[in-house]
């Protein structure tokens, strides 16, 4: 429960309160006592004792007409019968009010937050596995792939980083379930849309940066994308950063100026990988030793080193780190299947140019025969990826490419595929039925020298079409049908 008086006080302290509007009158303080038993931004979940948040560009006055709620919070006075708390920024208001309503669960958990263009989910699973070794399985996880609030039962995530109200409720639920640690991914959109406003993480990790999510509905420029991701830095008590990433200099400069304790990793840093072979690697630095992971690729080993440094800052021992990394399984990340003819099928969530480039390089290094790539791209977001995908394909002439449907949303998947193909000088194949495209690629393999890469969807069991998630068999189940 939270009182209206408390809500107003929170908003005033954050310089986010304008007035209360009711029946044509304005109030700086409400004359009566009001208690809210619930917070919601979903009208379907609102009751007479709910404080409702009217947010979003598409919110309409008629949504409030028959709404059952006590008050609503908004940046706009809709002049309806329901009294309104008018604010400057409704998303910031929701974040701070939710934190108070759920009694600041973020302060009772040890939190590790990861950002970066690629590798967040893999690193999140690495970190959870390590911390589970340390705390006996008491680590909650919020990732792009899955969420668990009790360390054991998983469900599909809706967003990389949940809305602030949902996030604080999840944190409270994790505490109720006996969790002591939380690992979560923090997207650039989370900072742009204030989903993590007011939160300070015990450890923040910045894995890498490359152009992605650039488009009219996400970030207008690379600068905006990078700036939003960089907000994790000043909202972390300890920070781990990749010294080899683009634009690292400003990260180092800001960390030093803000006097935030930190660790860097990379070839020219104190913490580095000095030997790498297959699934095995050796590190030097503050976490020095031999490690094994279940994923191929130097980039996965670098992510493992980043999470080793981050979890060490939370108290993990060398053995916790070694055992955790060795046991970590990441759904939809370099999942490996073997066809009857010996060909390998790699299923991976790689959904931007940098992650696809790294994936292709790893597979090329391990297969001398034919390489097949099944790939699509998202609709109505991340439009810059299409050029990036085209450039990866162009730079790897060994790839036999079948362009298909990803989450096309409200765009024509053939139009998306054509745009990818426009950046490639050689002929590509098209098959918009994703399952049939997978079947087609596998059928073309001949022996163990050959490989198929199925990129973009990972473990997703849906396809986004016309704004709705439609059931999809999943890349791995589809591939298994045709082995």
Swiss-Prot record:
It is an enzyme of class 6 (ligase). GO terms for cellular component: cytoplasm. It is found in: Cytoplasm. ATP binds at residues 116-122. Pfam families: Mur_ligase_C, Mur_ligase_M. Carboxylation is probably crucial for Mg(2+) binding and, consequently, for the gamma-phosphate positioning of ATP. UDP-N-acetyl-alpha-D-muramoyl-L-alanyl-D-glutamate binds at residues 43, 160-161, 187, 195. GO terms for molecular function: acid-amino acid ligase activity; ATP binding; magnesium ion binding. It comes from Lactococcus lactis subsp. cremoris (strain MG1363). One of its GO terms (biological process) is peptidoglycan biosynthetic process. Its main location: cytoplasm. Its EC number is 6.3.2.-. Gene3D superfamilies: Mur ligase, C-terminal domain, Mur-like, catalytic domain, MurE/MurF, N-terminal domain. It comes from the Bacteria. The modification N6-carboxylysine is found at residue 229. Keywords: ATP-binding, Cell cycle, Cell division, Cell shape, Cell wall biogenesis/degradation, Cytoplasm, Ligase, Nucleotide-binding, Peptidoglycan synthesis. InterPro entries: Mur-like_cat_sf, Mur_ligase_C, Mur_ligase_C_dom_sf, Mur_ligase_cen, MurE/MurF_N, UDP-N-AcMur-Glu-dNH2Pim_ligase. Catalyzes the addition of an amino acid to the nucleotide precursor UDP-N-acetylmuramoyl-L-alanyl-D-glutamate (UMAG) in the biosynthesis of bacterial cell-wall peptidoglycan. This is UDP-N-acetylmuramyl-tripeptide synthetase. Pathway: Cell wall biogenesis; peptidoglycan biosynthesis. Belongs to the MurCDEF family. MurE subfamily.
């Amino acid at each position: 429960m939270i009182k209206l008086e408390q809500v107003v006080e929170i908003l005033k302290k954050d310089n986010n309160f304008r007035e209360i509007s009711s029946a044509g009158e304005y109030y700086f303080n409400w004359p009566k006592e009001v208690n809210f038993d619930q917070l919601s931004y979903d009208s379907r979940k609102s009751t007479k004792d709910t404080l409702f948040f009217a947010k979003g560009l598409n919110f309409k006055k008629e949504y409030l007409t028959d709404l059952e709620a006590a008050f609503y919070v908004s940046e706009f006075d809709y002049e309806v019968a329901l009294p309104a708390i008018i604010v400057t920024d409704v998303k910031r208001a929701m974040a701070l009010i939710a934190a108070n309503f759920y009694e600041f669960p973020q302060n009772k958990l040890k939190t590790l937050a990861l950002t970066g263009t690629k590798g967040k989910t893999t690193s999140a699973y690495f970190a959870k596995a390590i911390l589970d070794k340390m705390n006996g399985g008491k680590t909650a996880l919020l990732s792009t792939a899955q969420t668990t609030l009790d360390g054991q039962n998983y469900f599909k995530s809706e967003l990389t980083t949940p809305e602030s109200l949902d996030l604080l409720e999840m944190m409270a639920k994790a505490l109720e379930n006996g969790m002591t640690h939380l690992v979560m991914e923090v997207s650039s959109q989370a900072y742009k849309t204030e989903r993590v406003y007011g939160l300070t993480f015990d450890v923040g990790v910045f894995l890498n940066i490359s152009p992605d999510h650039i488009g009219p509905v996400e970030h207008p420029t690379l600068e905006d994308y990078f700036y939003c991701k960089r907000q994790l830095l000043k909202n972390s008590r300890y920070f781990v950063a990749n010294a080899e990433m683009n634009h690292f200099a400003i990260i180092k400069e800001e960390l030093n100026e803000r006097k935030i304790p930190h660790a860097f990793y990379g070839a020219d840093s104190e913490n580095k990988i000095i030997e790498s072979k297959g699934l095995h690697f050796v590190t030097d630095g503050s976490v020095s030793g031999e490690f094994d992971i279940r994923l191929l690729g130097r980039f996965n080993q670098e992510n493992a080193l980043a999470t080793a440094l981050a979890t060490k800052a939370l108290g993990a021992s060398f053995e916790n780190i070694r055992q955790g990394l060795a046991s970590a399984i990441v759904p939809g990340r370099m999942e490996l299947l073997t066809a009857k003819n010996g060909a390998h099928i790699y299923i991976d969530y790689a959904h931007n140019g940098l992650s696809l480039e790294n994936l292709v390089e790893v597979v090329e290094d391990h297969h001398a025969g034919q390489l097949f790539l099944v790939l699509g791209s998202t609709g109505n977001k991340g439009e810059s990826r299409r050029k990036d995908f085209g450039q990866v394909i162009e730079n790897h002439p060994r790839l036999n490419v079948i362009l298909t449907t990803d989450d096309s949303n409200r765009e024509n998947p053939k139009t998306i595929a054509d745009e990818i193909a426009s950046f490639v000088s050689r002929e590509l194949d098209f098959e918009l039925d994703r399952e049939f495209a997978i079947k087609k690629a596998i059928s073309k393999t001949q022996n163990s020298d050959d490989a198929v890469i199925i990129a973009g969807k990972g473990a997703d069991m849906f396809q986004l079409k016309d704004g709705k998630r439609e059931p999809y068999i999943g890349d791995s189940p589809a591939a298994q049908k045709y082995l």
